[in-house]
């Protein structure tokens, strides 16, 4: 069995889990998430925890059990606490402003960039150069943060661009004459 799948997923108070066929739905204070469980993985619902068992012992099935456990753990954490990513804008005139479901970005282009946020994702701008992306789906929060970063990645000479708050940009030295 996968070492990851051996550990059960503990359900905090206020989180409900429903298993109908191969569809697992997790409901919590922040919302509801659903996942189709792979047919080779069996989910055992016990008192206050979930266990994941591979139906047969081959390597691929054990790996799928571990992957499923990690995905469900992220779902449980998302509906109870939520996820967030912080982005920073570095550069002269780089600004961000959140208006409802649209994030307006000024990134040094000749035009402003308007990014439409998907359902379940919220963006805040505590300052003009900071963006806070929140949601219950870990994959979607990371995907939105990556798409915003891709508008203007940090460049290695001056470090200008959109970067994750914890990202360290490797700097290059300018060309010498």
UniProtKB/Swiss-Prot annotation:
Q: Which GO terms describe its biological process?
A: cytoplasmic translation
Concerning NCBIfam families, the annotation shows: L6_bact (TIGR03654)
| One GO CC term on file | cytosolic large ribosomal subunit
> Gene that codes for this?
rplF
Q: Which InterPro entries match?
A: Ribosomal_uL6-like (IPR000702), Ribosomal_uL6-like_a/b-dom_sf (IPR036789), Ribosomal_uL6_a/b-dom (IPR020040), Ribosomal_uL6_bac-type (IPR019906), Ribosomal_uL6_CS (IPR002358)
Q: What is the organism of origin for this protein?
A: Pseudomonas syringae pv. syringae (strain B728a)
Could you confirm whether the keyword RNA-binding appears in this record?
yes
Question: Record's HAMAP family?
Answer: Ribosomal_uL6_B
Function noted in UniProt: This protein binds to the 23S rRNA, and is important in its secondary structure. It is located near the subunit interface in the base of the L7/L12 stalk, and near the tRNA binding site of the peptidyltransferase center.
Q: How does it assemble?
A: Part of the 50S ribosomal subunit.
- Name of the protein in its database record: Large ribosomal subunit protein uL6
What's the family?
Belongs to the universal ribosomal protein uL6 family.
Molecular function per GO: rRNA binding; structural constituent of ribosome
- Which UniProt keywords are present, listed alphabetically? Ribonucleoprotein, Ribosomal protein, RNA-binding, rRNA-binding
């Amino acid at each position: 069995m996968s070492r990851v799948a051996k550990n059960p997923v503990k359900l905090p108070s206020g989180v409900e889990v429903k298993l109908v066929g191969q569809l697992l739905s997790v409901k919590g204070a922040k919302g509801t998430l659903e996942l189709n469980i792979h047919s080779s993985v069996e989910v055992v619902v016990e008192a206050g925890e979930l266990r994941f068992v591979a139906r047969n012992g081959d390597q691929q099935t054990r790996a799928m059990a571990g992957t499923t456990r990690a995905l469900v753990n992220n779902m449980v954490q998302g509906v109870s606490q939520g996820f967030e990513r912080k982005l920073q804008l570095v550069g002269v005139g780089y600004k961000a402003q959140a208006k409802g479901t649209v994030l307006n970005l000024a990134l040094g282009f000749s035009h402003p960039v308007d990014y439409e946020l998907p359902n379940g994702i919220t963006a805040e701008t505590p300052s003009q150069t900071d963006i806070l992306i929140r949601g219950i789906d870990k994959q979607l929060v990371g995907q939105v943060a990556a798409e915003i970063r891709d508008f203007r990645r940090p460049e290695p000479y001056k470090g200008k661009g959109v970067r994750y708050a914890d990202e360290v940009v490797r700097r290059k030295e300018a060309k010498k004459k």
